[in-house]
Amino acid sequence: MPKNAPVKRTAFNVSISIALRDRLRALSKSLGVKTSVLIDEAVMGLLAKYAEKGGIQLMSDGEARQTQHVICVASGKGGVGKTTTTAALAYLFSAIGKKKVLLIDADAQTNLTQLMKANIDGKRDIQGAIITRLVNPDIPINTFILPTQYKNIDIIPGNPFIEEVGFLSQIRKAKLDNDVNLWIEMMNAIKDIQEYDVIMMDTHPSSGLPTSYPLQACDYVIIPLEPDPSSVSGFKEVYKKIIQARKVMNPNIKLLGYFFNRVKANTGSAKQFIPTARETIPEVISEVNGGAEEGKFFDTVIRDSEDVRKAVILHSAVTERFRSNKVGKDFEKLYLEVTEALANG
């Protein structure tokens, strides 16, 4: 619409207090602005405020849509519980939050795909979803989305050769002088179908290229840690990748938070290390991020539990199979912290 085009108006009968009416008239007269314009601007401001608070997008067509959160679960080392965390939180987003969730298995080990019992066929997976953005973007992204055993959770299955996709992006950039990332194109295609409230990616356990590419296509990052010194160094490397992604391709990426996982609560090493790490890791963030703070060190500590290993064997989210047990309750506390952090942006 042209900038000075008249705004179409319609009758919308509401009652306001006499005091508010008098204030509107006085302000209108003082500013030389119609009361209808003042009301429009005031209502738009309130709509934006409460939409942001509720995580809702107000569309130009008048529809209100829930904001889509794209969350990467990343780590600089294996064995810290990325896949368990991704599945556990996804289930709780669905069960408690009543969200429609899409999982993306971006780890060549494809553990998340196996855990969620996706009926894989070797054709519809993440490699296909990304490569079609290059060779035939008209193929609907839904083609590569499969149901899981859970009603409101779908998945784009993993592929052991997912690392090759990164090299395709580099070749594309070299040949076409095109900086558009295939991961971003895939994510845009997913967002466009407007079917999912939460999109969660399980990434490769490293600080190299297999982790870098997914980070360029997500909004938030959650980092699980184990209570040992190597986790701090691994955290630093992953956080560097977040900063790099922010500078190169994804200016809006944020570290949502980080937490301790698989903690043997009664061991002296955990009791000594965790308080120290709660001071050390924020210092690492400040060092890498030019003095700025970022992300929440979640209060929740996920205790080590045999139930996690049982859930893996049973191909289940631990929060579904053992929700009433201690580890299930731990993850539920973490979920509440995560949703609060998302609400606060």
Regions found by a protein language model. Give the residues of each.
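P-loop NTP-binding core
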Residues: 2-12, 22-26, 30, 35-37, ...
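Short, structured motif recognition centered on aromatic/hydrophobic residues
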Residues: 16
